[in-house]
Amino acid sequence: MNWTLASPEIVLALCGLVILLVGVARNRREDTFLCAMLTLGAFLVTGLLTVSGALGLGFQGQFVADPFAVMVKLLILSGASIAVVLSLDYNRHHGMERFEFPVLTLFSTVGMMVMVSASNFMTLYMGLELMSLAIYVLAAFARDELRSAEAGLKYFVLGSLASGLLLYGISLIYGFAGTMDFSALREALAHPAGTSPGLTVGVVFVIAGLAFKISAAPFHMWTPDVYEGSPTPVTAFMGTAPKVAAIAMMLRTLVTPFHGVLVQWQHVVALISVVSMVWGALAAIGQTSIKRLMAYSSIGHMGYALVGLAAGSQAGIRGLLIYLVTYVFMNTGTFACILAMRRRGRQLEKVSDLAGAGRTDPALALLLAIFMFSMAGIPPMSGFFGKLYVFLAAVQAGEPLLWGLAVIGVLTSVIGAYYYLRVVKVMYFDDASEGPFEAWPTSVSVVAVGSAIFTALFFLFPAPILAAADLAAKALLR
């Protein structure tokens, strides 16, 4: 039974080892494409196993497979697959055709899937470190670029600090509760004598460690430099799948064992949410690099997502999951458009480089405008519905704290709309200083168009995603 529950993770890890052996044995630059295709195949097989696999608790209560884990894992696999597709042309063009890229992405994905199914703090930490160590290397994958090496080093140093905070919090929880198992913690906290100030401090440290992984303010200091310095496909990857995994881990960690003490951690999450929304909205206004703009944008988006977590209700969890689905596709679509910004063999990253794109590159301008409107929360784009369900959950909770969160969220969305619409203004109303961009690679076109279709037409078919999110929320609160 244990092996059946973890079959997606086991199969994906074994596939990673096989692909690694293939890459090492052949060790030819042209085999990078083969390894990437094998990785995508492994992701597909893992996705099928995840959907059709058994549900339950295994490995002596340390691993859980439930509808919540299934939905989040499929979202993680989607984000990882898109990142591998985006890397195909980019790595070849920048002399980074090495088989290690898809392999590292694969092992990072294994760690994320373990995190999502963790029902014990030790399992959680093992998955977190497997994910993080692979991403540290990916951030510095462009070895010949100084800023990429700087991004990897900065992410590693600050990530180690965050892991230390998380471990310290776990040790406090274990010291005061005597267990690291989520179900045992929930039973212990059901009694009035089960809570203590030391346990609360431990939970706060755990929240701080996980907030770093989702780049929520004030634990966001690594985000702008790492986003800008990392290769763009890596930025697209770390901006989606790892954040989905980390915020899902926050959900399972806080809702499953600590739902009985919601009041004690709700204010901490609400504070992080407010700071993230405000800082993300204000700091992005003056950015000239579109990758740094996306970094601050992601900080704000995580603030909006945390509104659903602060609600702590089924509606809040459902809203958060819907938000994550919309976030992944509009984010990866935006980075696909950034990868299409290339002239004379040089990758461009400035907002000003988009000047006049509405006339010189109408397809790129249209797709990027769709993603900008969605991130701003303008209907009928998918980003509007993501924010709508999160804010509705906060309002329906009926608490003054959550009402305040919803109001701040709406206000910061209005502020944030300025820098998203500024990109649209530059594309359609500024004069073009240079000619059109180079022809799009097929891989970039597929991701950009597919993400745009999902983002623009989400309102026509929301039912399957709403139903899956509702089922996942019920499973988490069960």
From Swiss-Prot:
Q: Name one GO biological process term.
A: ATP synthesis coupled electron transport
EC number annotated for this UniProt entry: 7.1.1.-
> Where is this protein primarily located?
membrane
- Entry keywords, A to Z: Cell inner membrane, Cell membrane, Membrane, NAD, Quinone, Translocase, Transmembrane, Transmembrane helix, Transport, Ubiquinone
Which subcellular locations apply to this protein? Cell inner membrane
Q: Give one GO term, molecular function aspect.
A: quinone binding
Superkingdom of origin organism: Bacteria
One GO cellular component term noted in the UniProt record for this chain:
plasma membrane
- Which reactions fall under this protein's catalytic activity? a quinone + NADH + 5 H(+)(in) = a quinol + NAD(+) + 4 H(+)(out)
Topology relative to the lipid bilayer, per the entry, is: Multi-pass membrane protein
Q: Say yes or no: keyword Cell inner membrane present.
A: yes
Q: How does it assemble?
A: NDH-1 is composed of 14 different subunits. Subunits NuoA, H, J, K, L, M, N constitute the membrane sector of the complex.
Could you tell me which HAMAP family the record lists for this protein?
NDH1_NuoN_1 (MF_00445)
**Sequence similarity:** Belongs to the complex I subunit 2 family.
Name assigned to this protein: NADH-quinone oxidoreductase subunit N
